[in-house]
UniProtKB/Swiss-Prot annotation:
Region (Nonhelical region (NC1)) location: 520-680
Protein name: Collagen alpha-1(X) chain
Biased composition (Gly residues): 314-323
Region (Nonhelical region (NC2)) residue spans: 19-56
Main function: Type X collagen is a product of hypertrophic chondrocytes and has been localized to presumptive mineralization zones of hyaline cartilage.
UniProt subunit comment: Homotrimer.
Region span, Triple-helical region: 57-519
Annotated stretches, region: Disordered: 55-523
Pfam families: C1q (PF00386), Collagen (PF01391)
Originating organism: Homo sapiens
Encoding gene, per UniProt annotation: COL10A1
Signal peptide: 1-18
GO term, biological process aspect, one: skeletal system development
């Protein structure tokens, strides 16, 4: 019986296919009106609205009608006919449903849309404690909490000095302070090297001395020059001259010793500093005190599910939406201490409770991470004086900055944020024990109300006993370094020791002229314009004067401007050089007669600054510097008295290539002179 089922299915399929083919593909075209009903064909009458031309094929020769044969298999489809012209007909009625096709494995369909989330099921039994997960990334900082009530201010022992913070931005220059007490005169430093500053203005003239008595007129010949006398006694210090122009800043000196700590009023609170570099993650803190149980949640209790087997630890998923709080479960076993979580926002202030019993003193916990500074709290009651702290190590002296211009006094700045919270103080005094009330029946859970206003601060408790000093807290963020207001001037110190004698003052002005003396003509006096008599006077040589003293002198002029740097300046135009002790080719004067010489020079400055030096045997004796003013022709000069021995050499030289504006021309002369004052 079973093998005949496929045969019957094939026969039924062939019958259906043949009937369908006869009705669809053997329907005549181009016929209007009702068609005859036959047993073999059934045509549905329809109306053709198109007025197009019906295309018909060529009519063949009609054959004799043969007997009806059995239905054969459907032949292959013929070639497509010529395209017809006409409007599309009306949509036909739906055909009969075909037989069910053979079952086959289809392609997977497009995944459907996610269904609606079902209702939350009941809480299953508490699972086993899973392995400690990796700490998640640090969340963003929460909003600043509402400042709490002012605590009892108890000064603790000062902690150790923290590390030096990063230097803040440069503050505005403060007001000029009062001049300090002059210090002791330091030792004379070594000779510095630098461009000489401008000469200061001439000081005030000294007091006029009394007029001396006029001496009797002397009679006699002029004597020879005497030996130079001993240097005079150091005169009294003159009045200080007016302050000269400010010279260029000198090189930075070494940092001075730390002065004594001053006593001044605390400056106004500076602006809040820039946030410091985030510190490293601290050690995990001790577990906190368990908070009060939250309000009961609202949820439909579901059927308790069966406890499933523990599956493998999956990857940490993303944070889901916050669900409603379920009923309080049974307390489980204490799990392992996890890493400290991020600090949540501060909750609303609760109603102040009654004073509880003082708990035992806990151990000092590790320092927690620095919290965000809260708003400035109310001022607490003054605490007892703490023990004096250990003096901190003196910091390094910073480099001396350039003096800034005194700025206007600014308005007092906004109060800065309070510092980090101090360590937890000791417990207060034991309060009065309260009466335990009777436990009332548990009411139905109410709808959580809106957040109420912040309550007033509670009554401060009695100050407790002074606790042990806590561990030093982490260093706070670096604040903006601002200079505080100048403190009041302290009392004058004791008089210092007598200072060193000052430098001699400037010479005073000349005194009034004395009475005229009597004119007495000495023997051998020669009037102006009168030629001396040569009778009895010996002839003199080029190296010897009239009196028989040796002579050595010269005056030369520079004919070309801007001489070479680092070599003697060759003054090549000679006004006087009879002894030939000066060489115009090299610009060097060579001493032939040992003695005391006087040298002077006068130069012009054009184009840039000039710095000229007088050298003796390659060593500079003195310098002259002139700062050039654009559009002007400046002058500079110098002179010196030098003792020379035989074969000593003296010359002028430009030591610096940046200050070489020595100028000389045909009508603007720069000169160099020297002569023997006294032989030795």
């Amino acid at each position: 019986m079973l093998p005949q089922i496929p045969f019957l299915l094939l026969v039924s399929l062939n019958l259906v296919h043949g009937v369908f083919y006869a009705e669809r593909y053997q329907m005549p075209t181009g016929i209007k009106g009702p068609l005859p009903n036959t047993k073999t064909q059934f045509f549905i009458p329809y109306t053709i609205k198109s007025k197009g031309i019906a295309v018909r094929g060529e009519q063949g020769t009609p054959g004799p009608p043969g007997p009806a044969g059995p239905r054969g298999h459907p032949g292959p489809s013929g070639p497509p006919g010529k395209p017809g012209y006409g409007s599309p007909g009306l949509q036909g009625e739906p055909g009969l449903p075909g037989p069910p096709g053979p079952s086959a494995v289809g392609k997977p369909g497009v995944p459907g849309l996610p269904g609606k989330p079902g209702e939350r099921g009941p809480y299953g039994p508490k699972g086993d404690v899973g392995p400690a997960g990796l700490p998640g990334p640090r969340g963003p900082p929460g909003p600043p909490g509402i400042p709490g009530p002012a605590g009892i201010s108890v000064p603790g022992k000062p902690g150790q000095q923290g590390p030096t913070g990063a230097p803040g931005p440069r503050g505005f220059p403060g007001e000029k302070g009062a001049p300090g007490v002059p210090g002791m005169n330091g030792q004379k430093g070594e000779m510095g090297y630098g461009a000489p500053g401008r000469p200061g203005e001439r000081g005030l003239p000294g007091p006029q001395g009394p007029t001396g008595p006029s001496g009797p007129p002397g009679v006699g010949k002029r004597g020879e020059n005497g030996v130079p006398g001993q240097p005079g006694i150091k005169g009294d210090r003159g009045f200080p001259g007016e302050m000269g122009p400010i010279g260029p800043p000198g090189p930075q000196g070494p940092p001075g010793e730390r002065g004594p700590e001053g006593i001044g009023k605390p400056g106004a609170a500076g602006a809040p500093g820039q946030p410091g570099i985030p510190g490293t993650k601290g050690l995990p803190g001790a577990p906190g005190i368990a908070g009060p149980p939250g309000p009961p949640g609202f949820g439909k209790p579901g059927l308790p599910g069966l406890k499933g087997e523990r599956g493998p630890a999956g990857l940490p998923g993303g944070p889901g939406a916050k669900g409603e709080q379920g009923p309080a479960g049974l307390p489980g076993k204490p799990g392992l201490t996890g890493p400290p979580g991020n600090m949540g926002p501060q909750g609303p202030k609760g109603i102040p409770g009654s004073h509880g019993l003082p708990g035992p003193k806990g151990e000092t916990g590790p320092a927690g991470p620095a919290g965000y500074p809260g708003a400035k709290g109310e001022r607490g009651s003054p605490g007892s004086d703490g023990k004096p702290g250990y003096p901190g190590k003196p910091g390094l002296d910073g480099p001396k900055g350039n003096p800034g211009l005194p700025g206007p006094k600014g308005d007092p700045g906004v109060g800065g944020p309070p510092g980090l919270p101090g360590p937890v103080g000791p417990a207060g005094a034991k309060g009065m024990p309260g009466h335990n009330g009777e436990a009332g029946p548990r009411g139905a859970p109410g709808i959580p109300g809106t957040r109420g206003p912040i309550g007033p601060p509670g009554i401060p408790g009695f100050p407790g006993s002074k606790g042990d000093p806590g561990s030093p807290g982490p260093p706070g963020p670096a604040g903006i370094a601002t200079k505080g207001l100048n403190g009041p001037t302290g009392p004058p110190g004791p008089p210092g020791p007598r200072g060193h004698s000052g430098e001699p003052g400037l010479p005073g002005p000349p005194g009034p002229p004395g009475p005229p003396g009597q004119a007495v003509m000495p023997e051998g006096f020669i009037k102006a314009g009168q030629r001396p008599s040569l009778s009895g006077t010996p002839l003199v040589s080029a190296n010897q004067g009239v009196t028989g003293m040796p002579v050595s002198a010269f005056t030369v002029i520079l004919s070309k401007a801007y001489p070479a740097i680092g070599t003697p300046i060759p003054f090549d135009k000679i006004l006087y050089n009879r002894q030939q002790h000066y060489d115009p080719r090299t610009g060097i004067f060579t001493c032939q007669i040992p003695g005391i010489y006087y040298f002077s020079y006068h130069v012009h400055v054009k184009g840039t600054h000039v710095w000229v030096g007088l050298y003796k045997n390659g060593t500079p004796v003195m310098y002259t510097y002139d700062e050039y003013t654009k559009g002007y022709l400046d002058q500079a000069s110098g002179s010196a008295i030098i003792d020379l021995t035989e074969n000593d050499q003296v010359w002028l030289q430009l030591p610096n290539a940046e200050s070489n504006g020595l100028y000389s021309s045909e009508y603007v002369h720069s000169s160099f002179s020297g002569f023997l004052v006294a032989p030795m």
